[in-house]
Amino acid sequence: METGTKAPEFIGADENGNEVSLNDFKGKKLVLYFYPKDSTPGCTAEACDLRDNYHRYLALGYQVLGVSKDSQASHRKFIEKYSLPFHLVSDPECAILKAYEAWGLKKLYGKESYGTLRTTYVIDEDGIIIDAIGKVNTKGHTTQILGSEK
């Protein structure tokens, strides 16, 4: 998805079964990140980078929300194990992943399969995508997201 376009509306359930939608973030800036699987090395590094810099996001008026195919129970364990201060949405049917072009063909060790494409969108207060990051540096993702913001 390109910057300057309207972010697709979505409705999903967080780790506690509470409904979460893009509309919940109207008037707020949102970091919406898509990742393959809870508790895997890259996904853990990415989540912990966001956690360790969460105060910076809040200071700049951002909310953070993660989305993966994992179950709500898996998300609860992931949040608890790593003390994540933000919510994670369960998308087992890949509806949100597909709407945000974060589901597609991947190549790993010469084999092709469909899966989650690690992607992050920064969405402004009006629901417009202001940044789209497709080549995520899991250990330094905050630098990619916030760039020159202080």
Residue ranges of model-derived segments:
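Chalcogenol-based redox active-site neighborhoods
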Residues: M1-K150
